[in-house]
Amino acid sequence: MHIIKTIKVLYKEIKILKKSNKKIGLVPTMGNLHDGHIKLILLAKKYSDIIIVSIFINPMQFDNLSDLKNYPKTFMKDSIILKKYHVDILFFPHINEIYPNGIEHQTFVEVIKLSKILEGQSRPGHFRGVTTIITKLFNFIQPDFAFFGEKDYQQLLIIKILVKELNYMIKIISLPTIRLKNGLALSSRNNYLSSQENEIAPYLYKIIKKTCEKIIKEDDNIRPKIIHESKILLIKKGFSVDIFDIYDYKNLEHPSKKVKKVILLASVWLGNTRLIDNKKIILNY
């Protein structure tokens, strides 16, 4: 595995790969790798000749400085994992390499509408940070494919819009959420959970599933009552609820009666840890 820390060296390597017509797959990460990342790498291998994984803890997408400071930095462990799965290139840049003039003077990229709602409303500037670093990585690496998990569904949708509207010739491929046996979605933030919170956390997806089952069975006018009861149940379990509702699968607007494909999005706090999850459903009208 070739570990690259500068854009200059990365450009040279990409130029060589492009000349040899190698298909490049990019898996962007912030490190602290788990089985979800590994599944993304394995998926990338099905499409790509060359696998590039980036590890960059992007300060631009953190709305909380203490969250940034406490984010796990596990480069040695991560690099061992990446070597084990035969990743070709690990791009591991320093912050000054990505933002040489500082974040406050950084030109940014933003998918305006979708970045301002839901998670974007709760975390101002977060998605601007995501789309700016993803744009930079796309420009540096020029991948044929880029791979993202579906757990961060709003982020996935934003990146798809970014690719379409900026005319990137990149295929975005998504991976269904990887879960523990108890249903908890894998996330680097799960490390923040206490032992007691780890016992409570799986209830989020259990309640999501039950809610979806009820929504499919019941009439449309009963839906607000179902959502409300599920929120109350989450609160009783110890969660603080930020987002818990169904949205149009394509644009995250509240669905009209004609929309059948919807997604239940959940964003909650458990102690000091933010957990997000979702489930797609097809409504019967």
Curated annotation (Swiss-Prot):
Record-level Gene Ontology MF annotations: ATP binding; pantoate-beta-alanine ligase activity
Full protein name: Pantothenate synthetase
Function text: Catalyzes the condensation of pantoate with beta-alanine in an ATP-dependent reaction via a pantoyl-adenylate intermediate.
Family designation: Belongs to the pantothenate synthetase family.
Positions annotated to bind beta-alanine: Q61
GO biological process terms, semicolon-separated: pantothenate biosynthetic process
Main localization (coarse): cytoplasm
Gene field: panC
GO cellular component entries: cytosol
PANTHER family named among the record's database cross-references: CYTIDYLATE KINASE/PANTOATE-BETA-ALANINE LIGASE, PANTOATE--BETA-ALANINE LIGASE
Organism: Buchnera aphidicola subsp. Acyrthosiphon pisum (strain APS)
Amino-acid positions noted as binding ATP in the UniProt annotation, renumbered to this chain: 30-37, 149-152, 178, 186-189
